[in-house]
Amino acid sequence: MSSPSESAVGNEPPRNQKVSLYADHNKAYPRYLNKGLFRQLKWAAMAVLLAFYWLAPWLRWDRGLGAPDQAILVDLPGRRAYFFFIEIWPQEVYYLTGLLIIAALGLFFVSALLGRVWCGFACWQTVYTDLYVWIEQRFEGDRNRRIALDKEPWSLAKLGRKAGKQISWVLLSLAIGYGFVLYFDNASTVTHDLFTGQASSALYGVVLLMSAFPYLLAGYAREQVCIYMCPYSRFQSAMFDEHSLIVSYEAWRGEPRGRLQGGIQGRTPEQVFAGRGDCVDCKMCVQVCPTGIDIRDGSQLACIGCALCVDACNAVMDRFGRPRGLISYDSSANQAGRSRGEAEAHTKLWRPRTFVYLTVIGLVATVMVYTFATRKTFDLNVLHERSPVYVELSGNRIRNGFTIRILNMVRGEGHFKLALDGVKDATMAVIGVDGEGMKEVELNVTGDSVGTFHLFVTAPSSSLNDKRMDLKMTVTNLDTGKTESHTNIFAGPDQ
């Protein structure tokens, strides 16, 4: 029997073994692929999204005199957001909540139908990473050349390639940061100020900050963002079912895999692949994968659904005269059916899961459209003066002071009527408006602004049957007939 000290020594890891809490990072070197359906779809998606990103701020939309004419604008100093004919005020931020709900449910709906198509084709991380890798390939070569270049000692040739890549990355990053700030001020003004040195240091700082994100995340972090930083990859599989379209490997057809011995000269494909699977273990599916995984190991968290492995495998199958689809973008139900020799089944688009997602999206969208169509064109806010709360006047009268704010949300001047209710024989006087002892008063508010008015409400002491009574103020828009009411207190001495 060994002694305790001997057992402890025997259980210790070797002294040269590295112990780590984290997985080692193996840099992915994606192979360049310029052919195939999904590769072309990725290029098309990138072109559309980047064109919209850089060109959308230059679109114009006439909103009238004195209003910004940029179609898409988030005016932070003016506390307003514009999207073509839609204008959102700060108190209407609930529209943003509705849009976020629709976006989330839309992502769930698309995931249930098409898998991680968002990650593979439309996510900004994927789009930018594709662009940065493309630049890297232009300077450093394709996969094998880049691997060899990283292993080579530093030389003028290596330095030149790396420097050219870095300069291009920095210029692209600055272009991305520049595009971002165009959404927050007039595009032509921002462009002029940035390129003539007249912009504020804060604006230059925002451009640099927003340039640093794609430079670091798309240039260096790349697949690490998708695997470790993005929360969507952690729960996306919960939205899949057997009818969701995912990238998968037909193991029943590809196994046993193995490299071809002796080539195919003089033999038919049936003779070459007799007694073995169609997979020739060329590892092209691994080499073109932006995250560096092997799809033959099954569906994985790191698979972003870009389907480049499908294009690569189809090209190999064409070369060897075998049917396409060894790696396919299909549902697991269809794949299981084919493995049993059943006829090709159609993907079920309408399922309880997709129906629920689409129904909730429709309900939220309907509520948003209704609230927008019936949105208020003005708002009312009333504040009671606190010092003093009330004043006792001669003739047994009580006076309370109020500040009212009328928000006119249209471009033209608004004409409003203010009326009192709830306190018998109450009258008012508005500072800056001629007349006293009025039951009603007309107030004008310039377009797209807040009108602030100070008024004094006076009532006989006999009208108060309590220390505090409810006073209702009603504002009527004389142009539209719509009303807004606010109930406050009318204070007095103890009765």
Where are these regions (language model features)?
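Cysteine-centered iron-sulfur cluster-binding motifs in ferredoxin-type domains/subunits
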Residues: 111-126, 218-233, 270-317
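Short aromatic-acidic-glycine turn motif
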Residues: 391, 422-435, 480-481
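Terminal connector regions
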Residues: 458-495
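Membrane-embedded alpha-helical bundles of multi-pass integral membrane proteins
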Residues: 2-257, 310, 323, 327-361
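Short, solvent-exposed loop/turn segments enriched in Ser/Thr/Gly
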Residues: 397-403, 451-453, 466-471
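Short acidic, flexible loop segments centered on an aromatic residue
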Residues: 412-426
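Long, low-complexity ectodomains and other extracytoplasmic segments of secretory-pathway proteins
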Residues: 346, 367-369, 375-394, 398-399, ...
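Intrinsically disordered, low-complexity Pro/Gly/Ser/Thr-rich segments with frequent PxxP/GP/PP motifs
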Residues: 432-461
